[in-house]
C-alpha cells in the first residue's frame, strides 16, 4: 500500500485512554498529542491500552492531533 503524501509518521507511547476511542500519546520527541484509532484498526477490533507503543500519523496542518495507524506487538 503506498504511503500518503504530506503526512508525518512518528512513534509514541499511549499515556491514557479517553472517551470515544481517543488517546493521549507521548511521541518519541517528547510532545503529547491527542489521537484517534484509524478505521482499519476499528474494523479488525485491535485494542489499544495505556503503555502500548504505537505509530501515529500527523497532518502537517495540525500537529496536536493524530491518527493511530499501528500498534506494536
From Swiss-Prot:
Paired cysteines (S-S): none
InterPro entries found in the cross-reference section: NA-bd_OB-fold, RNA-binding_domain_S1_IF1, S1_domain, TIF_IF1
Keyword Cytoplasm: yes
Domain S1-like residues, every copy: 1-73
GO molecular function: ribosome binding; rRNA binding; translation initiation factor activity
Localisation per UniProt entry: Cytoplasm
Family: Belongs to the IF-1 family.
Assembly notes: Component of the 30S ribosomal translation pre-initiation complex which assembles on the 30S ribosome in the order IF-2 and IF-3, IF-1 and N-formylmethionyl-tRNA(fMet); mRNA recruitment can occur at any time during PIC assembly.
UniProt-recorded name of the protein: Translation initiation factor IF-1
Species in which this protein is naturally found: Kineococcus radiotolerans (strain ATCC BAA-149 / DSM 14245 / SRS30216)
Lineage of producing organism: Bacteria, Bacillati, Actinomycetota, Actinomycetes, Kineosporiales
Gene name tied to this protein: infA
